[in-house]
Amino acid sequence: PKFAVAAAVQLPNVSDIEFESSLTELRELAKTLGYTVVNTFVQKRASFDTTAYLGVGKREEIRCYVNNDSGSDEFEEIVIESDGHDISALLVDHEISPSQARNLENEVGCEVMDRTMVILEIFHRNARSRAARAQVEIARLGYMAPRLREAAKLAGPQGRQRSGTGGRGAGESHTELDRRKIRDRIAELQQEIITMEAERK
């Protein structure tokens, strides 16, 4: 079995019942992907941390748990008890930005999947018909597109540009090429779905 931990921030406008219900649902979704959620980390905050979704102390707590680490002196009150489980993923009960996911991943030391990614992965695994698979792929590509935009910003003005090689136009970066491929693939899939619907009639 694969082991995961879940994490969520409770905002002031979310009731305890709503919050726990959403987390319970995430744990059930995780089971569908073959994960056993062995611990859940929650935090009440006025807003999400813009850098990495969770606050610094909570991120350190998760890092210690995932890595079986006793923690730094600053966070010496943290109790580490991961029961020997090898944690392969942190499941976040919200949709978070690519930079938040990456920062969280770097800090806690395991893969980070937000709620949207978990749901899309379930759809992908369960899609049986050609039309269903095409629709799921469109959804996944749509999820990836803004993440590529953010990656391009982080890559800086160069964006690893090289002119006119490997199918790229002059000065087109890898990221721009990826985004163009995504747009082309979405258009292709949408056309496939239209064709399949016409064939059924």
Region spans (language model):
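Conserved phosphate/pyrophosphate-binding and hydrolysis machinery centered on Walker-type P-loop NTPases
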Residues: 16-19, 52-56, 94-95, 127, ...
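Short alpha-helix plus adjacent loop in nuclease-associated cores
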Residues: 117-136
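N-terminal accessory targeting/assembly segments
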Residues: 1-115, 119
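Acidic-residue sensor for enzyme active/binding pockets
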Residues: 25, 105, 137, 172, ...
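Conserved G1/Walker A P-loop phosphate-binding module
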Residues: 1-7, 14-15, 151, 155-201
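Conserved hydrophobic/aromatic pocket- or pore-lining residues that grip, position, or stack substrates
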Residues: 90, 141, 182
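Conserved, well-folded catalytic cores of nucleic-acid-processing
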Residues: 29-36, 62-72, 103, 107-111, ...
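Contiguous effector/interaction surfaces
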Residues: 1-3, 7-12, 64, 133-149, ...
